[in-house]
Design a protein with these regions (language model features):
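Extracellular protease catalytic domains of secreted zymogens
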Residues: 34-207
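Generic detector of short, locally flexible boundary/turn motifs and exposed helical patches
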Residues: 1, 25-26, 73-75
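Surface-exposed acidic, glycine-flexible loop patches that form ligand/cofactor-binding
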Residues: 23-24, 50
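Active-site-proximal loop motif in hydrolases
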Residues: 1-20, 29, 34-39
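Solvent-exposed polar/charged
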Residues: 24-27, 102
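Active-site phosphate/pyrophosphate- and oxyanion-stabilizing loops and adjacent acidic/basic residues
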Residues: 19-23, 98
Length: 207
């Protein structure tokens, strides 16, 4: 096509981060970038549908916002794609559910911190990214609207529990990403915008 969304400096870094994380984990993957026309849920959801139409089987989404009572209808419109693994970042503001991570049709991806741990088999220790005092950290919590899916058996939330899985997200050990659009070049990124594409790439490796 020839009609593309306008370039956006706010999204440029996010896009570069997502592409770099997928290619780092799965260098042989065929990567398809689908951009939404705006940041509205309808346009973002339409981009997910478009990716599925184009043949994508593993889709990463690094965005989210406050929940809304209309989210359950968006679930069926945009995220109910049997046979397609859809990952969504859980957010970077600590405790509190965000959408579309709350959708029962997606894998909600939280974040961890890695630290060197010499003398251990793995060589690293891993803990949840965030602090007990609040502020920046991996999003988590109980959905206010989305029903608990049958595959969740925890008792902590009456409705959908977030997150499902996690991957490294701490900006303190972030990824150097080159942003060529209205930016200063190399920047270090982290957050669950990094962990969501990691998990999508792992799904792709697993087939």
């Amino acid at each position: 096509g020839t009609s593309y969304p306008s370039a956006d400096s706010g999204w440029a870094g996010e896009i570069s981060l997502g592409l770099d994380m997928v290619s780092a984990v799965c260098p042989q993957c065929h990567i398809l970038l689908v951009e939404a026309r705006t940041a509205s849920m309808s346009d973002l959801g339409t981009a997910v549908n478009r990716a599925v139409t184009l043949g994508a089987k593993y889709i990463s989404n690094s965005y989210g916002g406050d929940e809304d009572s209309s989210d359950t209808s968006a679930d069926s419109q945009y995220f109910n794609h049997p046979g397609v693994a859809i990952t969504v970042s859980s957010g970077d503001e600590g405790y509190g559910a965000e959408y579309p991570a709350a959708s029962k049709y997606v894998t909600a991806v939280g974040g961890t911190s890695l630290r060197r741990a010499s003398g251990t088999t793995r060589g690293w220790s891993e803990s949840v990214w965030g602090s007990s005092s609040g502020g920046e950290g991996a999003g988590s919590g109980c959905s206010a609207y989305d029903a608990k899916p049958t595959w969740q058996t925890d008792t902590g939330c009456a409705r959908r529990t977030i997150a499902d899985v996690s991957a490294v997200a701490d900006p303190a050990t972030g990824l150097a990403v080159y942003d060529s659009y209205q930016a200063s070049g190399w920047n270090v990124y982290g957050g669950t915008s990094a962990s969501s594409p990691i998990i999508a790439a792992v799904y792709a490796l697993a087939g």
